[in-house]
Amino acid sequence: RKYEVDSLCYPLQLAYLLWKETGETSQFDETFVAATKEILHLWTVEQDHKNSPYRFVRDTDRKEDTLVNDGFGPDFAVTGMTWSAFRPSDDCCQYSYLIPSNMFAVVVLGYVQEIFAELDLADSQNIIADAKRLQAEIQEGIENYAYTSNSKGEKIYAFEVDGLGNASIMDDPNVPSLLAAPYLGYCDIDDEVYQATRRTILSPENPYFYQGEYASG
């Protein structure tokens, strides 16, 4: 199956928001605890994809539907971020660290810590420690590798990076996306880097930007 980091973020987000909006806690059962442990383990393994058994090869004429290097994916360096095979759009990643999805992971790892601290679920201390460590390492990876510059020399977030110096300037018309970073709770909407990123994405510097008579984006 196509692996996307955000596919594991959403169950954690949904469980957390249900609790916060309604007070409901029945979702935090043994299955939730086990699933959370698996998510933390998988994201940790994929901090260095060389340790992962995941491969994806599809017989297709559409290069976006399969991974290069016999299903292993493109070359990368370890950054602290967690590796992704595919984007929310289901297209494969050009570079293996999808910044919006790593931002989303940072947010939901904070949710995990809050859930297990306040509700004192099974194995809380170990899960909190693992989530805190992973959150810090992914955030450090974002801070060290996720930035690039636009044509004006402004500091912006890249869409994807490989840790080897390559980066893409674009966005995905889904959530998570760079444009949706404040919506997800990753950064403030007035953040200087976010605003520069937003201006860049919503301009011809984004190769997928389109402007017509009545709309642009």
List each language-model region with its residue ranges:
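Long, well-ordered core segments of solenoidal/helical folds
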Residues: 1, 33-52, 68, 77-79, ...
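The tetratricopeptide repeat
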Residues: 11-14, 108, 181
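Catalytic cores of carbohydrate-active enzymes
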Residues: 44-59, 97, 110-193
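Generic structural signal for hydrophobic core residues of well-folded globular domains
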Residues: 15-18, 116, 184-185, 201
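Aromatic-rich carbohydrate-recognition surfaces in CAZymes
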Residues: 1-64
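Short, flexible helix-coil linker/hinge segments at the edges of structured domains or between repeats
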Residues: 49-93
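Solvent-exposed loop and edge beta-strand segments that line ligand/cofactor-binding
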Residues: 1-6, 88-102, 158-177, 186, ...
